């Protein structure tokens, strides 16, 4: 009798672990996509402000604005993400990327089915998410999104990275 119950228990634990890993992968990818959207918004803002068809000028200006914007999310200080706040970087909860000194242990909250950077104690999850933007060259940034969580006393993490370059 104990054998089937043990097997059923292990199957449930495995399913829970898989669900958490899938959620973490989606949260990590959301971090990458948010930084990419920030780059795109800077380009579009510079393009519209220039009132010109010169896409190269807008691309350069947009890239420089993007690099300056995300520079606080570097190796020594990463950022956390709350995608429901206005797009930007700040040291407080006024922008989507919040500067967080290492080790950054800011938890995500699940409110109404949405993962956020703020919430109540009853909605705190075991997930943490950090965004790091490392300059590779003048025209390339390496974006790393890391989501970590604890399950049955073991810490797990999903790391997704991408390289962003200026619009051409």
State each model region's role:
Residues 1-29, 38:
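Aliphatic-rich helix starts adjacent to a transmembrane/signal segment
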Residues 26-168:
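Low-complexity, Gly/Pro-rich coil/beta segments used as flexible assembly/activation regions
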């Amino acid at each position: 009798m104990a054998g089937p119950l043990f097997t059923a228990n292990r199957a449930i634990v495995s399913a829970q672990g898989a669900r958490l890993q899938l959620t973490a992968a989606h949260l990590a990818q959301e971090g990458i996509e948010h930084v990419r959207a920030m780059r795109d918004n800077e380009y579009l803002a510079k393009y519209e402000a220039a009132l010109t068809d010169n896409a190269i000028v807008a691309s350069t200006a947009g890239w420089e604005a993007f690099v300056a914007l995300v520079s606080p999310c570097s190796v020594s200080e990463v950022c956390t993400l709350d995608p429901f706040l206005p797009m930007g970087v700040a040291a407080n909860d006024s922008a989507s990327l919040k500067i967080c000194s290492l080790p950054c242990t800011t938890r995500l909250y699940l409110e109404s089915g949405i993962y956020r950077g703020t919430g109540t104690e009853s909605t705190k999850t075991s997930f943490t998410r950090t965004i790091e933007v490392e300059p590779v060259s003048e025209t390339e940034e390496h974006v790393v999104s890391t989501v970590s969580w604890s399950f049955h006393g073991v810490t797990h993490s999903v790391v997704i990275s991408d390289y962003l370059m200026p619009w051409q």
